[in-house]
């Protein structure tokens, strides 16, 4: 087996850790089975594409940036904000560089460029992806609040304050105003009318 093929396969196994690693901040407030990092990255990618379409940016690029935004957490895990005051971790671009070392050049460049663009936050797509990260956190906090976890308001407040695009702020305010399952009731009524 070639070294690049071995390293690429190993990288794909490494990325699988994101399905098992949990978002640690939720555990701090008593959520017994918090979402995984992969759960978060998936919905953030969907949100990024929606925001980009609403903002006139490239939905595919925004979703792609969001897809890679937490890939470094296979090595540094999801470090809670309080913990960041006491420990330091390598920057995301450095971690990504270590992760992609040994991969085919085209693959390494694709991933490194996506992470660099996301971190720089200069493109509309990167801003949409970064807002998607925060908006997913807000949505998740609202869902956990509805399940009885009352200590999540700081996540809602900080996520809302961090949003930079008009579309993300509008969706956030709507998310705060409605129940997370209101869509289901609307869908049931629409299905009943269609029959």
Short names for language-model regions:
Residues 1-195:
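Active-site helical microenvironments for divalent-metal-assisted chemistry
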């Amino acid at each position: 087996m070639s070294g690049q093929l071995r390293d690429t396969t190993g990288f794909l196994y490494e990325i699988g850790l994101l399905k098992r690693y949990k978002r640690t901040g939720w555990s701090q407030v008593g959520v017994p089975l918090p979402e995984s990092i992969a759960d978060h990255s998936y919905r953030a990618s969907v949100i990024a594409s929606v925001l980009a379409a609403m903002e006139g940016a490239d939905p595919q690029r925004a979703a792609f940036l969001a897809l890679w935004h937490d890939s470094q957490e296979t090595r540094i895990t999801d470090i809670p904000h309080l913990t960041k005051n006491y420990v330091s971790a390598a920057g995301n671009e450095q971690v990504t560089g270590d992760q992609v070392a040994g991969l085919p050049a085209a693959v390494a460049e694709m991933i490194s460029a996506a992470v660099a663009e996301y971190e720089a936050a200069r493109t509309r797509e990167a801003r949409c992806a970064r807002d998607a990260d925060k908006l997913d956190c807000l949505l998740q906090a609202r869902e956990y609040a509805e399940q009885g976890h009352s200590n999540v308001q700081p996540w809602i407040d900080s996520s809302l304050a961090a949003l930079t695009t008009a579309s993300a702020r509008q969706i956030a305010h709507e998310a705060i105003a409605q129940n997370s399952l209101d869509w289901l009731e609307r869908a049931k009524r629409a299905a009943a009318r269609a029959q």
